[in-house]
């Protein structure tokens, strides 16, 4: 068993505040020993692991955080590999399940062709860097997903449904199967479900059954949010999780591994604003994804990736109606054009200008721009504006819920409309005038809307409604390896820590529908298997006193600008002047009243800008004997400040020589 010195232990412990942990977890025997008589025999030195210093309330081989698809797959796989597992879930049972429970239950499938999947997912990265091993791992899973779900999770292949070309009630589901038909490898990509249905929780229920079928190996703790990871401060090994249960904190020992499967941060407004630059929005999926796992991973040194990547909705520029907190938002004109997003209907932002093609079929919130599909930049406020005729068409088609129709406010003129929604009337007037021109001429020079989806405003009445951006899910989180290991900022695996699912998803740019579920299953399997593997014993520590002689204030100081001394001969003089950053110091040698040498003793000028002046000018001062002659020397182009400072320093030295 490896031993680590007390010096190394304390160094790491102090870095993570573990001294407080040790003190809080010390047994009563420690205080008893401390109060013993000084004449007592010295206590025997003991060796212990960091885990020995923590008071544990429960112990498992593997702790899984989160009970969505990723967590359930990780737990099931770990159990099948011989581990005793606990899933800790922040929600009560009826609210658990994350996005998995409420999503479309669609899974990306490459019809057995891994190479096609690799080509496709590489293209979806849009030129962004992503490790080939990650592409290989997701492609392996997506290519074989039909067999994986049948062979490992008990789904019936005879019930599978391919959604390619399927249109349901005006919703063109086939538009996502594949979602990017222009990309290489698309011919093999499709969306499948495990039975003839969607958005019904069927896949979630089947995965959950795999957990309940393993009650001898898997415990589930509902209403038990993970609060922090417990980490050895020296080796950085994650040895357990602190969980809040029944109002108390409990430390759960994880002998072999911890899997973070806590989803994204779409329900954390602060994180959404910080990472996605989206202010006013409404989430669509599970309402409890608040970035908990991301913050816990950061606290133990995890690197983050893809934090600016997210998926939105499927129509009307990915905006939606505002909803109360905790209520999933509606999807509008999903994968379709209808009375809401065609005709005399536009979206304007805070300044009254259009910012998006309202009729475009949106790909998970992504809109086409210069050869790539990206999330639009949403203004602070968004307003939906229609005319009298359009309102009638919406009502006739039943394209908008009655409660939302009731929120439309009528205005008799554009000026009244502008005042009512708080935008500049001149700009809004120009916006509507331009849109009418685009509609009449069949060409949208602002946002590229197709002619058949535009109609000029009738000028009778204007109706407006406040809207917000719709957010389906986020992709960012702790960076992971192809082995589902969570990586630190140096690219090294944090020992015993794994992740799967949307908490650090693999999507870096464009997103194929069904990939999040596919990666929950793919990386859940990898994480569960690797977390279950028996690990080497933790190192032990020997605590003993050491002597030290620390440097005192002032002993070590690299501060620029401190007074320095320089050696000079009888005919040498030190000149100084302020450069771009620090002072420039020269030693000038004077013979018979003229400069014979200039040495630059100190400079902190910028490489490639100021430094050339310090290298080229000194020889130009040789032979000069007056301030005027020195200042007349041509400076170095692009280094005026450095050149002038150097001249000033040389003049300063020459004046000393002349007395």
What are these regions (language model features)?
Residues 58-60, 248-257:
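Core beta-strand elements of the Rossmann-like FAD/NAD(P) dinucleotide-binding domain
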Residues 253-321, 517, 523-526, 530:
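Glycine-rich loop(s) and the adjacent beta-strand/alpha-helix scaffold that form part
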Residues 566-659:
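Active-site- and interface-proximal helix/loop "cap" or "latch" segments in soluble metabolic
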């Amino acid at each position: 068993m490896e031993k680590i010195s007390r010096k190394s232990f304390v160094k790491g412990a102090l870095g993570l505040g573990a001294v407080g942990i040790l003190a809080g977890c010390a047994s009563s025997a420690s205080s008893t020993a401390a109060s013993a008589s000084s004449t007592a025999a010295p206590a025997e030195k003991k060796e212990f692991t960091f885990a020995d210093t923590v008071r544990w309330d429960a112990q498992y081989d593997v702790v899984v955080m989160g009970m969505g698809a990723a967590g359930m797959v990780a737990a099931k796989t770990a159990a099948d590999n011989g581990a005793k597992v606990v899933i800790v879930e922040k929600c009560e049972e009826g609210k658990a399940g994350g996005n998995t429970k409420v999503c479309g239950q669609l899974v990306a499938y490459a019809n057995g062709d891994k190479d096609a999947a690799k080509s496709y997912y590489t293209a979806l990265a849009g030129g962004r860097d992503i490790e080939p091993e990650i592409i290989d791992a997701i492609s392996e899973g997506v290519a074989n997903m039909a067999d994986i779900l049948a062979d490992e999770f008990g789904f019936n292949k005879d019930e599978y449904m391919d959604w390619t070309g399927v249109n349901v009630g005006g919703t063109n589901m086939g538009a996502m199967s594949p979602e990017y038909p222009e990309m290489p490898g698309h011919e093999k990509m499709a969306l499948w479900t495990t039975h003839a249905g969607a958005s019904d929780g069927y896949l979630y229920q089947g995965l959950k059954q795999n957990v309940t079928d393993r009650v001898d190996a898997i415990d589930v703790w509902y209403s038990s949010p993970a609060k922090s990871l417990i980490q050895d401060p020296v080796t950085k090994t994650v040895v357990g999780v602190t969980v809040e249960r029944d109002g108390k904190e409990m430390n759960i020992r994880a002998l072999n591994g911890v899997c973070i499967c806590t989803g994204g941060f779409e329900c954390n407004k602060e994180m959404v604003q910080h990472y996605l630059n989206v202010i006013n929005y409404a989430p669509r999926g599970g309402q409890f994804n608040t970035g908990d796992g991301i913050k816990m991973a950061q606290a133990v040194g995890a690197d983050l990736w893809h934090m600016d990547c997210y998926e939105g909705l499927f129509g009307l520029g990915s905006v939606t109606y505002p909803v109360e907190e905790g209520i999933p938002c509606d999807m509008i004109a999903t994968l379709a054009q209808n009375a809401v997003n065609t005709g005399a209907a536009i979206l304007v932002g805070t300044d009254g200008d259009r910012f998006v093609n309202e009729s475009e079929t949106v790909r998970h919130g992504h809109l086409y721009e210069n050869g790539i599909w990206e999330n639009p930049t949403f203004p602070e406020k968004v307003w939906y504006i229609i005319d009298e005729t359009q309102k009638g068409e919406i009502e006739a088609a039943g394209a908008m819920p009655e409660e939302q129709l009731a929120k439309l406010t009528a205005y008799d003129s554009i000026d009244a409309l502008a005042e009512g929604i708080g935008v500049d009337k001149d700009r809004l007037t120009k916006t509507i005038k331009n849109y009418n021109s685009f509609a009449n001429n069949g060409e949208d020079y602002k946002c590229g809307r197709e002619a058949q989806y535009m109609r000029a405003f009738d000028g009778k009445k204007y109706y407006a409604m406040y809207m917000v951006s719709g957010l389906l899910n986020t992709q960012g989180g702790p960076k992971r390896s192809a082995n589902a290991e969570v990586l630190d900022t140096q690219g090294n695996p944090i020992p015993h820590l794994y992740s799967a699912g949307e908490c650090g998803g693999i999507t870096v740019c464009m997103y194929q529908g069904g990939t999040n579920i596919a990666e929950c299953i793919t990386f859940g399997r990898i994480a569960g298997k690797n977390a279950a593997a028996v690990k080497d014993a933790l190192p032990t520590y020997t605590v003993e006193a050491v002597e030290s002689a620390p440097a005192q204030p002032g002993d070590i100081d690299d501060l620029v600008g401190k007074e320095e001394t320089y050696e000079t001969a009888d005919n040498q003089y030190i000149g100084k002047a302020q450069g771009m950053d620090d002072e420039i110091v020269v030693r000038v040698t004077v013979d018979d009243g003229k400069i014979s040498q200039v040495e630059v003793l100190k400079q902190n000028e910028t490489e490639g800008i100021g430094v050339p002046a310090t290298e080229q000018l000194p020889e130009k001062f040789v032979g000069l004997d007056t301030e005027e002659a020195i200042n007349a020397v041509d400076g170095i182009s692009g280094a005026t400040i450095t050149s002038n400072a150097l001249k000033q320093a040389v003049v300063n030295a020459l004046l000393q020589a002349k007395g």
